[in-house]
Amino acid sequence: MSDFQREQRKNEHVEIAMAQSDAMHSDFDKMRFVHHSIPSINVNDIDLTSQTPDLTMTYPVYINAMTGGSEWTKNINEKLAVVARETGLAMAVGSTHAALRNPRMAETFTIARKMNPEGMIFSNVGADVPVEKALEAVELLEAQALQIHVNSPQELVMPEGNREFVTWLDNIASIVSRVSVPVIIKEVGFGMSKELMHDLQQIGVKYVDVSGKGGTNFVDIENERRANKDMDYLSSWGQSTVESLLETTAYQSEISVFASGGLRTPLDAIKSLALGAKATGMSRPFLNQVENNGIAHTVAYVESFIEHMKSIMTMLDAKNIDDLTQKQIVFSPEILSWIEQRNLNIHRG
């Protein structure tokens, strides 16, 4: 594939993603908090700091990976980096493969660091890149963490995608052992299982982003790029973010779990934190905001999102993220069936 074709593919991904709409129904709607009428705290008591062994985020919300590798996406990364700088959010760039292959593309990613020199930035590579390239990806952005995206359904629907996956787990193990910053194993919208969590724990992984279905749909994106558009029947493949977080429960004491995929509102973010996530990521909502409404409106959107999270936590009488994990939740029969059939051990306060 030529560099021009790769740039074109990057642009197609963003164009199709922006055209997708939020799911009408979400598993976040299948879980409810129990309301208690009189809080014992004030809004000003809320501490939204997200603390993991290696990363401290001012807020448990981050701009998740989407873009880079073309001139248009350079402009998007530039604007998102300004939003991150002005709001204190962490930010992940899209796959840096284009820059690792072609130095001419490096600026489409490094613009994020240029515009946000003191901020928290995650670099991003695929599970098949050599260790040396993973190290380069971290150095390229002076990144505080490295996402490794695992996207086998996307690759298999992508006309020119990868068809070989046997080496992925061993390669991830090599990268984790060599890279000095936290390595986050990131799904791309298909969710994670307890079996995968076991395998990742065995090779020393300490961070995952479960990225469940319900948000940006890469099966749909790649199917749109197929000549016959003949794999639309896989549109609903995978676990939701709620199901994925439940799948991780037994591993949350040893692996820091981030949640993304289909988060629509501050309440969805709070529900993710209550299920054990340490932070929540969104990509398309920020992408649409910054492209359609500009930087200032996107900053205001983020500030409002954070304030709404504080209001919800006050209603729940939760001073911090750890308190949220003790709050009572009522699940729908469908989610309870998932828990039972998957033999998940869910204990709450």
UniProtKB/Swiss-Prot annotation:
The keyword Hydrolase does not apply. Substrate binds at R9, K10, S95, T96, H97, Q154. SUPFAM superfamilies: FMN-linked oxidoreductases (SSF51395). One of its GO terms (molecular function) is FMN binding. It is an enzyme of class 5 (isomerase). It catalyses: isopentenyl diphosphate = dimethylallyl diphosphate. Its cofactor is FMN; NADPH; Mg(2+). FMN binds at A65, M66, T67, S95, N124, K186, S211, T216, G262, L263, R264, S283, R284. One of its GO terms (cellular component) is cytoplasm. It holds the Pfam family FMN_dh. Signal peptide: none annotated. Belongs to the IPP isomerase type 2 family. Involved in the biosynthesis of isoprenoids. Catalyzes the 1,3-allylic rearrangement of the homoallylic substrate isopentenyl (IPP) to its allylic isomer, dimethylallyl diphosphate (DMAPP). This is Isopentenyl-diphosphate delta-isomerase. It comes from Staphylococcus aureus. The gene is fni.
